[in-house]
Design a protein with these regions (language model features):
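Short, contiguous acidic/charged loop-to-helix segments that flank catalytic cores in large enzymes
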Residues: 23, 307-324, 348-357, 378-385, ...
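Conserved Class I SAM-dependent methyltransferase catalytic core
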Residues: 28, 255-262, 322-395
Length: 510
């Protein structure tokens, strides 16, 4: 848990960076991410040295043994003069981590020139983390030695006094990511953690699943899945399942390399060291993945449109459109194995849009697969990022139908106020949603006037496959009795007399 003390220390670091001239929150997080990664390399090196001393067995090291190589270690430069730290970072550490290979940093020659690690065709690049793979175009943007020293001092204080384990590092990074308060150009924005956690609870991943978010952003859904697995299976997972957990279980795609670095770091801080984090336009022809994953969790971009020529033909065959929110639904169905589960967020327009593309994707979900639930969320859920109304769709890929009825739930509260402040409140439907969804047999007799209810497939089909809850929800109107016209007029006359009397009294006083 991130305490108030930790938040204050992070906010202080943030303020120091802003004062130094970096005001874009994404750039701030990116620069902090680099420093956290650099520190983590030294921690791994220290662990390797401890093991060597205990076991007497020689291990491969991250840092070169030369003076230049050892000078790149966090523990060696953190207490130096600010100008020396800045030069070390600028001239050695940063160039070296951009050329990291096989889990090792390159060395420098006598002239201070970087000596790249030679390719070894017999050895795959398994030593590099997903984060290191996306460092080649990274830029060191911290402007001055003084700002860098303040950041390093602040981070070192956090790690020394407040961050006890990997879980705390992950929570700290989540708090930093919470400062990303602006949506991207393609309509992507960060999904609140409690909404992600709810969606993970709905699909209930297992240690043998293959989980994918094809629009991963900061990898929030993958992190929430990892946290769910550790909470429910940590004591029973086999060594093979832990190996699966550390890498191939989790896949994320994005078209923003900065986001790929941030997502890889987020996963690394949650014990997932080698996930499949790839630069990929998921709905384009470059992505041909089919029937590979058992779980998809996503909040795909809403406002984005893509070049019609680049869209994968398989997706256009299901819904012929350029709208990303529709294309991603077709993508989930293609990428899932038969029996795979998906929970995804869609804008309300997907539920009731009347275009052929809108209707065709809804028909595909209902007629050819099993659409299990439509959970309508209030428009304030994504504030302050966006005020768009959204819903969560939960479905299973079958390829053979299976939708006999669809469960609808009208979420009215999510535990936070629905204004820009999003302060914590008592009202919260999420525990109720999870409990009802996992006991749908008890929902059969609910009336349309209640917060959740079933709608048969035939009725949905007859309404153009409309999935908006208001199409089927019934409202009980309580009759209100108003006073008669005679009574209202009598009250008005009485009021007029009181006003006249009051005016007369005022005139006498003048």
């Amino acid at each position: 848990m991130v305490t108030g003390t930790i938040k204050n220390k992070v906010d202080k670091i943030w303020t120091d960076i802003w004062a130094g001239g970096i005001t874009n929150p994404l750039t701030v997080i990116e620069q902090l991410t680099y420093l956290m990664f650099i520190r983590s390399l030294d921690e791994k090196e220290l662990a390797t040295e401890d093991f060597e001393n205990m076991a007497g067995e020689k291990m491969e090291h991250i840092f070169p043994a030369s003076a230049a190589g050892q000078s790149m270690r966090w523990s060696r430069f953190k207490d130096k003069d600010s100008r020396e730290i800045f030069l070390t970072m600028q001239q050695r550490v940063f160039p070296a981590i951009k050329k990291m290979k096989y889990g090792r940093l390159p060395d420098f020659d006598a002239n201070g020139e970087l000596v790249e690690i030679a390719d070894d065709p017999t050895r795959p690049d398994e030593g590099n983390t997903a984060f290191a793979r996306y460092m080649d175009d990274a830029m060191f943007l911290i402007p001055t030695p003084q700002v860098l020293q303040k950041i390093i001092t602040g981070l070192e204080d956090l790690y020394t006094h407040d961050i006890a384990d990997l879980d705390m590092q992950g929570d700290l990074y989540e708090y930093m990511l919470g400062k990303l308060a602006t949506a991207g150009q393609n309509g992507q924005f960060r999904t609140p953690k409690h909404i992600r956690d709810m969606m993970v609870e709905l699909v209930q991943p297992t240690p043998d699943d293959f989980i994918c978010d094809p629009a991963c952003g900061t990898a929030g859904f993958l992190v929430s899945s990892a946290q769910y697995l550790r909470a429910h299976y940590e004591d029973s997972m086999t060594p093979e399942q832990w190996q699966h957990f550390a890498g191939p279980m989790f896949t994320g795609f994005d078209t923003d390399r900065t986001m790929l670095r941030i997502s890889a770091m987020n996963l690394m801080l949650h014990s997932i060291t080698n996930p499949e984090i790839d630069y990929k336009d998921s709905v384009s022809k470059q992505n041909s993945i089919c029937s590979k994953y058992t779980v998809c969790l996503a909040n795909p971009p809403f406002k984005g449109t893509v070049d019609a020529e680049s869209i994968n033909d398989d997706l256009k065959a299901v819904t012929n459109t350029k709208k990303t929110e529709l294309l991603f639904l077709a993508l989930f169905l293609r990428m899932l194995k038969t029996g795979g589960r998906c929970a995804c967020i869609v804008p309300d327009g997907v539920l009731f849009g009347s275009s052929k593309a809108h209707q065709s994707i809804r028909k595909e979900l209902i007629e050819n697969h099993q659409l299990r639930a439509v959970i309508s969320m209030p428009s304030g859920v994504f504030k302050p990022y966006a005020g768009v109304s959204t819903a969560v769709l939960v479905f299973t890929k079958t390829g053979a139908g299976g939708t006999d009825r669809v469960w609808f739930y009208d979420m009215k509260a999510d535990g936070f106020s629905l204004d820009d402040k999003r302060t914590e409140v008592k009202e919260n439907d999420i525990p109720d949603i999870i409990a009802r969804f996992h006991n749908l047999d008890a929902e059969t007799d609910r009336k349309r006037t209640e917060q959740s209810f079933f709608v048969p497939k035939e009725e949905i089909a007859a309404n153009g496959y409309d999935l908006s809850i208001n199409k089927y929800k019934e409202t009980e109107y309580v009759p209100v009795e108003y006073p008669s016209t005679t009574e209202i007029l009598a009250d008005l006359h009485e009021l007029e007399m009181e006003i006249t009397k009051g005016l007369a009294e005022l005139e006498e006083m003048v």
